[in-house]
A protein has these predicted regions:
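Cofactor-binding active-site loop characterized by glycine-rich and histidine/acidic residues
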Residues: 23-24, 29, 41-143, 151
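Cofactor-/ligand-binding subdomain signature composed of acidic, glycine-rich
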Residues: 1-34
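RNase H-like, Mg2+-dependent phosphodiesterase core
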Residues: 12, 148-154
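Alpha-helical hinge/cap motifs
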Residues: 16, 143-145
Length: 154
């Protein structure tokens, strides 16, 4: 399994396109197994697997900041940022929260649950980056049940 060898976004970048497709299947299989036994958010996560893999393939998290508007869609992100065991192994299912959580990982920047906060949070991160004269992108991960969009605030 490719997911077992993913300890951070840098490992995603090492995979070929075919391997990335298999990784997406493995993520969905792991989510289905965990969420069937433990509960959690199915739809928001299943619909964002490829987009999450692509973001971690293209951007440099945590230097590039990814902000989730609906952070209960962040399970694939958690799996790709060092928290895969909480989705692969039943004894670790309670190791992560159902939302983004900066106490869990440097790849999470806010504790957020539901919608309508990401634009202002992303703009705040971009302004702070500019004031500190730092580099990096800020990606606003906006999503609803029917559509999704991603904004890169540079």
């Amino acid at each position: 399994m490719y997911i077992e060898n993913i300890n951070g976004p840098e490992d995603v970048k090492k995979l070929s396109e075919d391997q990335l497709n298999v990784l997406a299947e493995e993520i969905r299989d792991s989510l289905l197994k965990k969420l069937s036994k433990h509960g959690g958010h199915f739809g928001p996560n299943f619909g964002m697997v490829e987009a999450t893999i692509a973001m971690h393939y293209v951007f440099e998290s945590p230097k590039d900041k990814i902000v989730y508007d609906v952070s209960h869609q962040s399970y694939p992100h958690k799996m790709l940022t060092g928290r895969k065991d909480a989705f692969l192994y039943e004894e670790h299912y309670d190791d992560v929260s159902g939302y983004s959580n900066p106490r869990e990982s440097e790849h999470d920047h806010f504790t957020i649950g539901h919608t309508s906060t990401s634009i202002s949070l992303a703009l705040g991160l971009a302004k702070a980056r500019d004031l500190k004269e730092e580099n990096g992108n800020v990606i606003d991960r906006k999503s609803t049940r029917l559509n999704s969009s991603h904004r890169c605030i540079s």
